[in-house]
Amino acid sequence: IPNRANLEGILYNTADGTPRYVIEAEELLRYSGDRSFLRDIYPSVVLSIDQSLRHHTDEKGYLLHADADTWMDVKRNGIPGSPRGNRANDIQYLWYKQLEAGAHLARLMDDAPHAEVWHEAAVRLARNFEADYCNKDSLLIYDHLNADGTPDLQYRPNQLYCFELIADDDFKQRVTCRVWEELVYPWGVASLAQWDLQFHPQHENWHYYHKDDAYHNGTVWLWNNGIAMQRMIEYGQQETAWKLFQNMNHQALHEGAVGSLSENADAHPREGKTWAGRSGTFLQAWSNSEQLRVWYQYFLGIRPDLMSGTVTVEPKLPAEITELQTSVKIGRGTLYYTYKDGKFDVRLEGEDAKVNLILPQAAAPNPIFQGVDFCQPRPLEHYPCFDTYHEEALTY
């Protein structure tokens, strides 16, 4: 899948585009149950996976890519601002999900040979990933493996996407805690830890550096809020996740473009301020979509699978919510959802599927998460990035 297509040509610099195409195609089928859509796209699914297996994987099954071919894609004068080649952790996660989604679609198409090959490739990938990427002493999932096989030690949020590749649940819980403490500010998830020598405290600070140098090296990206909240909710920490969710709701309702979330924010507030300023695109689709995804799929817990004729509802609401009423379109029907006086009433009308309601269970506090809260700015008087000032920094 190209990153850009216009009259001048086609630009391929997105290693995540093709995996996401297959992953979201499967997701659409779960919500719609439209098998005619599957028949239409299945040849493209086969092509996308088989050609990647044949031409773009290494001996361990990892998907290979160039330095600026992940979502951290900025280049200035042809030089990547945050090089992640050639095996970024989130790309391996997306590749794994593409393989498993493809195997599921193959089974639905009665294509047993492809289903078996793709599933086996996914299992092999996950086995190698846990061995090669997980530093359990440092509670770190390496951001990427370099072309020479050495791991990159920069602390970035991409590791939160990789949990499906890792079996050790205790390790994943501890990684979640550390990511929140190092990267998750009250205004969003930073792209790089503030103790890194490449950290840039504000997105735009043209007296000292070009904004592209800060873009993925400290700047907050609101789209990563989704996975940060999701991981907390999965481990029963919805109260912590809710604080970030509420902060984003405040932005959507009272700041910037009303009803939307911005692309970015500064990691550290400006001098004299207590809250970081917004930056980047004032209305960013994936910032908004991730906020909504977490609300529907994890706080409300609505996860349809019309290909198997089921809709799972597993709510994990914060204590602050004592009453709500909503409805969600699923397939040809509507799911009506009410919560009041501690009781849930969920019913599906207009679609032939079984609703499985999994009620929340009281659980003892998890000591791993005790005391975990937002990362707080620890500003320095002088940052290494301030030393990069030159005339080019004034040119946008």
Region spans (language model):
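Extended glycan-interaction surfaces of carbohydrate-active proteins
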Residues: I1-N13, R54-R87, R127-V220, L253-W275, ...
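Aromatic-rich carbohydrate-recognition surfaces in CAZymes
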Residues: I1-H65, M72, A88-Y96, H119, ...
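A short small-residue
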Residues: E27, G78-S82, A101-G102
